[in-house]
Amino acid sequence: MDVVNPYFRSSDYSALLKKLGVELIAPVFANTTLDTPVLPPEIFSIFNMENADIFIDAGGDDVGATALGQLHRQIETAGYEMLYVVNRYRVLSTKPEETLPLLREIETASHLKATAIVNNSNLAVQTDMQTVLNAVPFAKKAAELCHLPLLYSTVPDFAVENTLPEGFKAVKRYVRFVWEDETE
């Protein structure tokens, strides 16, 4: 499901997602400049899918989580994992202490509780392994303050130097911002 976000909208990449076997459910106006967290009626079909992994990216704040809150009863009935993704280098959460109020806003708006934290600290194409390693203490402290387990830390595949240590997962980046050079 795509809850509209002006910086990254999965609906902008619907062809790529389809090619990768991902069914995208997005609001009709998802490819516009409107930033309104409204759910399309098709969203309710996810609760009838058997043997499917469902991912809902509600963004990193209470605005997207408000849309998610419309589904909280169905989500609770179906069972869920709600991962709180943190980034030490994000403006709103540069200190571990800043992650808890953001999490509480998201939980309040969504009427759901986070189950774990994922450390996705990165600096886009400038990320290297050290960038991620430097953020691990931040993520561990954030997890402690939020009373949640740290599930893992992500590392962009281009930054993986050797075999990743336990607690790290490589992620492939499929999209680029418009201002990035194609060769990056």
What is the predicted function of each stretch?
Residues 1, 56, 86:
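Active-site flanking residues adjacent to catalytic metal/cofactor-binding acidic residues
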Residues 1-37, 42:
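N-terminal phosphate/diphosphate-binding loop that engages ATP/GTP or pyrophosphate donors
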Residues 3-8, 31-35, 60-63, 91-93, ...:
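Short, small-residue-enriched loops and turns at beta-alpha junctions
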Residues 13-18, 43-44, 101-102, 133-136:
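Short, hinge-like loop/turn segments at secondary-structure boundaries
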Residues 47-54, 78:
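Glycine-rich phosphate-binding loop signature in dinucleotide/nucleotide-binding domains
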Residues 62-165, 178:
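Conserved catalytic-core segment of NTP-binding enzymes
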